[in-house]
């Protein structure tokens, strides 16, 4: 009850602050609202009113308003702000169009200010976001995970329901109707962990568009950002992925077999990509390909000629609806290439993309590992053998303790890497450590969970066997989850 009252007070304080901001906005006058039209045809205004109304719309459309008894306050604020319009994005047949006007030059998020001390305590905003996402994962993802795993596909409305959380919007600059004013790598890691606690397979299609938004924000040109980023700040977020992995043994992301060659009109891409979540409904890909002997990233729309998508379910992550992306002489314009004009700089930017994705996969291992721990502790305390709980046996107790020890080590390494990346510091070492820990210890989390449940761990009546299969993917996965 105390925690609930605290949450209600926190939400009400935020609503009241929004009301004050709106009042100040009214005092200086508002711009004439833009007309609604097709995606990207109108300039995006950077006014506080628009940002506040987007937040209120998300809260009003969810259960939070009734749960925390703030609907009356929201209605009062909304009534005062009826002149603010909202733009609805297209459906699966969308055409990405460049927005006119707006800020000049590509928009980059600033690095976070370096604190004088190492603090693992989340900020108030991070805590609120994490709690909201964790609740979504528990109420929506966990119950749907079993059926999604059996069907090898995520629910059709999953991304739309997740869009209410604003997971993608927090990586889009304010200039494009987003909510970001600086890099939020740590926040993205916390969000990925919270979603994976519900189910890692279902977390992938939700996080994949956010990875594309990160790539566009970090390395996209002004034209690329104006064409694609506005779509990632709305309620109809396109299914999109950063695809790096290729279907071959001992895959090295820095030795790509997908090739890009120059053509009179731009580039032509050939190759095969794997680990593409929700591949059948994807609209946009950021494809890693080798250009002139060095890796680069290219924007490829799903409707491009020569793009073929095949289902490719695996042992784990079946709920993600994994597929393969076949690129057969796909022509893209020169403007489709992400990153700097200098090949060496572009290669380093690609390396950062790989490192960010490895931090993302480590975060998924953290969330799933925590799910294993939370599941086995009550089980070993309640399961009795020879007249006492099996947790009284040292072999069992030590195994549970080791999960917690290794999980905390993985979490520390991942958060340290995320913190350094957020501050614009080198994080190559930390990303490598997080990758190694996630690969080795993550798989051990799943294995120990199955062992602790005994025969039950091998059956689908318990989710631990699914988590074990999902965790085995950490060592071979690349891309997708850029934080």
Question: Can you say where each PLM-predicted feature lies in the sequence?
Answer:
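Glycine-rich beta->alpha junctions and the first turn(s) of the following alpha-helix
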Residues: 122, 309-409, 474
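A short core secondary-structure module
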Residues: 270-310
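Glycine-rich phosphate/cofactor-binding loops in nucleotide/flavin-utilizing enzymes
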Residues: 24-108, 191, 211, 453-483
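Short, contiguous pre-domain boundary segments
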Residues: 106-122
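C-terminal helix-coil-helix/basic helical segment that borders enzyme active sites and/or dimer interfaces
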Residues: 142-150, 377, 381-388, 404-437, ...
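Internal helix-loop-helix
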Residues: 102-106, 134, 164-236, 278-284, ...
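A short, Trp-centered hydrophobic/proline-enriched beta-strand micro-motif
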Residues: 235-245
């Amino acid at each position: 009850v105390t925690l609930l009252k605290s949450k209600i007070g926190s939400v009400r304080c935020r609503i009241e602050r929004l009301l004050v901001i709106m009042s100040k906005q009214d005092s200086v006058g508002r711009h004439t609202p833009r007309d609604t039209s097709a995606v990207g045809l109108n300039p995006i205004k950077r006014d506080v009113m628009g940002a506040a109304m987007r937040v209120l719309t998300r809260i009003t459309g969810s259960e939070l308003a009734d749960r925390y008894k703030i609907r009356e306050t929201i209605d009062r604020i909304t009534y005062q702000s009826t002149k603010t319009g909202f733009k609805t994005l297209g459906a699966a047949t969308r055409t990405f169009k460049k927005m006119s006007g707006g800020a000049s030059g590509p928009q980059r998020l600033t690095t976070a200010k370096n604190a004088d001390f190492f603090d693992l305590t989340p900020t108030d905003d991070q805590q609120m976001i994490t709690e909201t996402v964790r609740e979504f994962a528990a109420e929506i993802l966990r119950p749907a995970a079993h059926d999604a795993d059996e069907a090898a596909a995520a629910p059709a409305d999953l991304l739309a329901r997740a869009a209410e959380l604003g997971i993608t919007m927090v990586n889009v600059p304010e200039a494009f109707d987003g909510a970001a004013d600086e890099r939020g790598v740590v926040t993205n890691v916390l969000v990925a962990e919270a979603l994976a606690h519900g189910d890692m397979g279902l977390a992938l299609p939700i996080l994949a568009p956010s990875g594309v938004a990160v790539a566009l924000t970090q390395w996209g040109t002004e034209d690329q950002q104006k064409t694609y980023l506005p779509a990632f700040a709305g309620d109809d977020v396109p299914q999109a992925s950063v695809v790096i992995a290729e279907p071959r043994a001992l895959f090295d992301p820095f030795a790509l077999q997908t090739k890009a060659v120059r053509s009179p009109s731009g580039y032509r891409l050939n190759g095969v990509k794997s680990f593409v979540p929700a591949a059948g409904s994807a609209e946009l890909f950021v494809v890693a390909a080798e250009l002139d002997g060095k890796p680069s990233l290219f924007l490829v729309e799903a409707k491009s000629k020569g793009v073929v998508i095949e289902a490719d379910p695996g042992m784990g992550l079946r709920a993600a609806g994994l597929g393969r992306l076949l690129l057969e002489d796909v022509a893209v314009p020169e403007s489709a290439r992400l990153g700097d004009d200098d090949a060496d700089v572009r290669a380093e930017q690609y390396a950062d993309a790989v490192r960010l994705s490895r931090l993302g996969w480590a975060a998924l291992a953290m969330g799933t590992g925590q799910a294993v721990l939370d599941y086995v502790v009550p089980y070993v305390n309640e399961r009795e053998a020879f007249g006492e709980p099996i947790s009284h046996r040292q072999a069992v107790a030590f195994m549970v303790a080791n999960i917690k020890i290794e999980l905390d080590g993985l979490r520390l390494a991942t958060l340290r890497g995320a913190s350094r990346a957020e501050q614009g510091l080198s994080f190559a070492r930390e990303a490598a450590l997080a990758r190694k820990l996630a690969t080795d210890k993550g798989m051990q989390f799943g294995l120990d969970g199955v062992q602790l449940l005994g025969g039950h761990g091998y059956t689908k009546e318990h989710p631990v066997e699914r988590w074990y299969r999902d965790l085995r993917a950490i060592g071979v996965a690349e891309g997708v989850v850029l934080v």
